[in-house]
């Protein structure tokens, strides 16, 4: 997913 590429995975 693009979210993981942007680093949103760290916000979760």
Swiss-Prot record:
Its main location: secreted. Keywords: Amidation, Neuropeptide, Pyrrolidone carboxylic acid, Secreted. One of its GO terms (biological process) is neuropeptide signaling pathway. It is found in: Secreted. GO terms for cellular component: extracellular region. The modification Pyrrolidone carboxylic acid is found at residue 1. The modification Arginine amide is found at residue 12. Myoactive peptide. Increases the amplitude and frequency of spontaneous contractions and tonus of hindgut muscle. This is Tachykinin-related peptide 8. It comes from Rhodnius prolixus (Triatomid bug).
